[in-house]
Amino acid sequence: VTNKRALVTGGSGAIGSVLAERLASDGCAVIVHAHRHVASAEQVVEKIRAGGGTASSVSFDLTDGMETRSALESLLKDGPIQIITHNAGIHDDAPMAGMTSEQWTNVIALSLNGFFNVTQPLLLPMIGTRWGRIVSISSLAGVTGNRGQANYAAAKAGLHGASKSLAIELASRGITVNVVAPGLIESPATRASFKPEQIEGLVPMRRVGTPEEVSALVSFLVSEQAGYITGQVIGINGGMA
């Protein structure tokens, strides 16, 4: 993947920042996306550059189709983006009986509508190169469901269906489309939500995964060696499912 342009949405977060650094170390020219956390994205870019990698940042609201398209059109002036990693997403948990329409809509707008808003404008330039990799970071909740996360699980399950369909559409063009569905991964939010003894009870491996482990899987999926893998939802969850 040397010198290929890679866009990482949500590139300032716990997984996104490590993923951006991994793709840069693989030789990609990484574009780190953020919306509200622009300063954090810039820090990721600076770290990549300090290590000898190539990186830049971009800021736009994934839920705004017109704003997203405008930002992507500017990026495409420098050539096609052949690797897309969708990592942006939010939680807004509540039992459905107490969930507001805003909670339902906002989570789906970012995780699912954002996938369309980013991917669609980049497809024709990618198809023109006859090589591409699209990987979305989903969640175990999208596979199994989870209490209090009907909105989040619906968004991620929708991402699975969209990715499987897109994989079929693009298979003859040298473009693969896959999903990585992590379980519990080390992050400030995970530490705040789960005590160590809870993790030992939930996860057969008795630990959380790391962003580096998720990034290693994505690194493989965007590589030449993974060219025959497409339309798959791949779990990375320590045996939880």
Give each language-model segment a name.
Residues 139:
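Residue(s) in the substrate-gating loop at a strand-loop-helix junction
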Residues 124, 168-169, 227:
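Alpha-helical segment proximal to the catalytic Tyr-Lys
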Residues 144, 219, 230-241:
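Short C-terminal tail/terminal secondary-structure segment
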Residues 95-96, 103-108, 199:
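Substrate-binding pocket helix/loop in short-chain dehydrogenase/reductase
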Residues 119, 155, 163:
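Active-site helix of classical SDR
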Residues 171, 176, 229-231:
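Short, small/polar-rich loop/turn modules that mediate ligand/substrate recognition or access, typified
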Residues 12-13:
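Conserved glycine-rich cofactor-binding loop
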